Amino acid sequence: MSDPRPNTLSPLATLTPPSSSRTWQTAPHPTLPIVATACSDRSVRVYSLTSFTLLHSITGGHKRSVRAVSWKPHTQGQSVLATGSFDSSAGIWRREEQGGNEDDFTNRRVGGAEDEDGRDDDDEDEYQFSCILDGHESEIKSLSWSPTGQYLATCSRDKSVWIWEELEDDNFETVAVLQEHDGDVKCVAWHPEEDLLASASYDDSVRLYREDSDDWVQVACIAGKEGHGMTVWWVEFEGSGISGKDFRVQRDGLSEEQTQHVDSMERSGPRLATCSDDRTVRIWRRKPRERAENASSNTGIPSIIRSAAIDEDWYQDAILPQVHERAIYSVSWSRTTGLIASAGSDGKIIIYKERWRKQTPNGVDTDNMQIDGSEPASLTEWFVLAELFSAHSVFEINHVTWAKRADKDKRYDGEEVIVSTGDEGEVKVWTLDEVADPPQRDA
């Protein structure tokens, strides 16, 4: 029997004015209560999450639709935005923030000289086009800054993944051109703690890369019978560390197997979420290297998957409940609560939550989640916490993400909202009304 779903997603706002053309993706700023939306009219629209109104319309840098946006982390005194376009180029935009420190910006929405509707009066406060990154032979589908902001990854319909390094004064150097995929590369995402990059593709595979002796190389490939059966649209890593609201954080009362499971997951590091045309959301987990190396040396039998010390083994940790009826375009893993949101072609937004299984398998090796393609023997399970139909009327949802809530009706510090980006040009903001905690495993 499926779990009851008393939790609801309630509409909070539609960002105004909406775009008159298709919107592809919305990226929350890492520190400010604003989001940037990539639009088919060749613009990027920057909205306030305080007033839900348009603050800036960034134009003039691209000749075709803007497909992807990504804010650079850890900037001081300025906001830096990367944009990827169907014109095959990536753009870098900068805005010098007026006001002093990030807390001032947050309290005053985005800082600078603004009138009552949140618009800037001074053209100098607008985003300035800084530089263009050329190299791809076809449209850019996704881009992402590394956790430190040192690298920018881009991917394209030309089947390649590029890694750029910013040197100084808007001078970017190409440090890698990775051509492991056999099809259109849909998405790239960085690990939150390491310079480890994941990519998803039309070739149904997920690939992971890292630097080895000054060269970027593929260290893992998730494909075939262990992977998705159709196009993989999105990849996103779990947040760094275990959230204070995560069900695993309270160790009192856990069984020995559960405690071992938590320890093993901490050794594995953040997991990876993917979604696909095959209508599934899947979670992948890295096999802890210490156990892998010890097992190989103790038996004298090397891993059949790993061909070198730098290679990694990633196993399927879970397939989330299959609720979507058509392709899933986007997943977002909350770094505050550990909840996952998904959205796609069927217009649904689904929220999933992880918990301990009521009955756990006996004798589970928590470091080996899957063997020879068999189903993973996990101690946890995911269930549907909330489900919303027709979130954008009859239109597809191209992207979904979690963001910090910043309006005056915020219910508590750290509250999050869900931001969905639709094919009709609207960006909508939703609250999750969680009225009951799920039942937990008996101690």
UniProtKB/Swiss-Prot annotation:
A Gene Ontology BP annotation from the UniProt entry: iron-sulfur cluster assembly
GO CC terms, sorted: cytosolic [4Fe-4S] assembly targeting complex
InterPro entries membership: CIAO1/Cia1, WD40/YVTN_repeat-like_dom_sf, WD40_repeat_dom_sf, WD40_rpt
Keywords: Repeat, WD repeat
Cited SMART domains: WD40
Keyword Repeat (UniProt): yes
Composition bias, Acidic residues: 113-124
Region annotation (Disordered) ranges: 1-27, 95-124
Low complexity composition bias: residue spans: 8-21
Chain positions of WD repeats: 14-57, 61-103, 135-174, 180-219, 221-248, 255-294, 323-362, 391-440
Function field: Essential component of the cytosolic iron-sulfur (Fe/S) protein assembly machinery. Required for the maturation of extramitochondrial Fe/S proteins.
Family: Belongs to the WD repeat CIA1 family.
Full protein name: Probable cytosolic iron-sulfur protein assembly protein 1
Organism: Phaeosphaeria nodorum (strain SN15 / ATCC MYA-4574 / FGSC 10173) (Glume blotch fungus)
